[in-house]
Amino acid sequence: MEALYLGNLNTVEFNLNLPKKGKYGSEIHWISGHERFLDTEGNVRRPAYGTGDRIISLWAEFFYKGVSETKEYKVCILEEKPKIEVTKVEPLQKKAQAGETTYLPYVAVIHTTEGKTLVHRILWENGAKRCYGQTGGFEERGELDGLSVPVSCTVTVEKELRKEKKGTEPLIEYFDHGEASLEEGSRFYTAQKEMQEFLLQTDDDQMLYNFREACGLDRKGAEPMTGWDAPECNLKGHTTGHYLSGLALCYKAGKDGRIREKACYMIRELGKCQDAFACMPGIGEGFLSGYTEEQFDKLEKYTPYPDIWAPYYTLHKILAGLLDCYEFAGIDQAFEVAQKLGMWVYRRLSVLPVEQRMKMWGMYIAGEYGGMNDVLARLYRMSGKKEFLETACYFDNEKLFLPLEQQVDALENLHANQHIPQIIGAMEIFRGTGEKMYYDIASYFWEAVTKAHVYTIGGTGENEMFHGPGRIGSLLTKHTAESCASYNMLKLTKELYRFENQKERMDYYERTMTNHILGGREHGTTGETVYFTPLAPGFHKEFEHENSCCHGTGLESHFKYADMVYAHEGQKLYVNLFLKSRLEWKDAGITIRQMTEMEHPETVVLEVESREEFPMAVRIPGWSGEERGLWIDGKKQDTMSVESGYLCMTVPEGVHEIRCLFPCGFYLESTPDRPELHSLLYGPYVLAALSKEERFLKLDIDPGKAEQEAEKDGLTFCYRGLVWKPLFEIDREPFQVYWEKV
């Protein structure tokens, strides 16, 4: 039964392959919960546009030697794409250089009669490729594909095209290479230690199974991987990439030599696999994956999913894992393997026409490429080889980038976690090129998502997809807030804060890290992470052991908690997160021990030792009240300096205790589209009511009265006859985050 894998059942658009025989000889009979949408032959009929997605129960009955057993699968069938009536097309403008080949925009932003803002493909007269022999203005004409709506683009041709630049020197530097570390006594520390135990008990040879199998090396008796990494699955290899990153980040966080030994073994063996691939006919030098080049060949012929499954997505995970092992665990061979693999990508893509690459990246799931632009631009930054930066730009996705350039939110119907890594890549390309456009689209994307597409826990997306701006209360289902989307939003937030230390970015970071990332792990050492955090009433977290994308990012997330606690701008130190932690800033001669208790987020306690005085800024959290206090060595400071949302001070040389008080209490947040739906928060924590009720609870909650009436035990509250807990305290109990205020 466990050997049977049906593919990603969360976003089904195509027919399923439902086998009649199991891998080991069992007979399989299929039963569908709704044959109108999914029959027992695997034929899929998508719901009409506007009627919503359908989650269908599918049962497999296994019969073997007189024994039978049944397994249920949940299949989410996506509704049909809309029939579009256009009311407006956003104007298109482009600059080009005389005598150089350029391409007209492949897409336009459109507005529809249903109030939607979407991106639609353009068919240009005489194609998209242009080369203008003289300077001046030109008007190009085309139409929206399949809609016969006219489109025009104004092209300004200049003698020499100058791209607007922005400085690439970071304003902020992080302590994210082990200088900051967690200290015992918090849920964050527990999560880090338990994930470390999971990594220590993981079989390295099993993680290498698919790679050795593909290149013909001995599998050393290891069992095959399962789930999304099963031998029959086309995404196999992605978890191994996450595992490499997890080992590297774990070593950075705790300096456990056993973890580094595992990472060294993995890199040595993957190096052998890379060498073995190079000796195989039809395999290019430097190639490395959990399968041969066949999926890449098929992608270039536009083979759809599920015949192939995102080969460049898997490659991104492998490359990222290699670079993490080099940067955070100091394994030089990992850098060598990564550069060889990067050159393989360059040689493969540099010979493809622009039109072909655009069509590949536009293919649903098959063309998904994770953060290939990110990892290749990072490889350029680390190696200085311009081929890697050039290749990173091959992954520019105009369908995503163009509306963001125009400062238009056209995210609806985009697969959230497919596109967030591409924006992280835009930031990395900005660091390599200095082109302001890449920075601007990343900044606008962050603003659009965090202002109009996030739930109260910081997570985004329903059924993996972005929906219309402000659609939150109408999309509270079992399939909300994909974990790896938040993982990537935090990565993006980190990169943006590096260049503009906006306090609001750290407010979002704290909210999402605390309530979604920490709240998404299974308690104990299973290593599991929820795929979705269900925000419909009465559901519980589901931990699936199938090597999903969210399992992969979960291998990494819990080793990043200390990375953003502290930062510095020159000699000025920022305290951004309030976790029990320690900082050793050796260059400045500063040591900080933070003793903030999670049960008392209102009191930030810092023990500071410094060889000379220095400026320090402590973030004033978005959840705190107007009144605040500052004590240095027990003496209350009568005056406090507040700048850009930070409590600023000069810390004298020597050893001192700094105590900051930020009033903390209950408060409510409502959803923009259904203002009667609320969530209850206490300081940085989103509180969930323990309840099996699958209808929204109707509650009369006044935050001021709750302060007086709620019974508090640690971070557990009893109020209105209900038990309320932060999400990270809840494991498998059913709960409600949102409820109806009466």
PLM-predicted stretches and their roles:
Residues 1-29, 82-116:
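Solvent-exposed, low-complexity, repeat-rich "mucin-like" stalks and linkers
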Residues 29-61, 114-159:
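Serine/threonine-rich, repeat-prone extracellular segments and beta-strand-based repeat modules
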Residues 160-239, 264-298:
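Low-complexity, Ser/Thr/Pro/Gly-enriched N-terminal "stalk/linker" regions
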Residues 188, 243-257, 316-332, 371-384, ...:
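Well-ordered alpha-helical scaffold segments within catalytic/enzyme domains
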Residues 224-240, 299-314, 350-369, 401-436, ...:
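Solvent-exposed loop and edge beta-strand segments that line ligand/cofactor-binding
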Residues 442, 506-606, 642, 661-742:
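C-terminal beta-rich recognition modules with glycine/proline-rich loops and embedded aromatic residues
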Residues 625-650, 668-673:
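Solvent-exposed beta-strand/loop surfaces of large extracellular or lumenal domains
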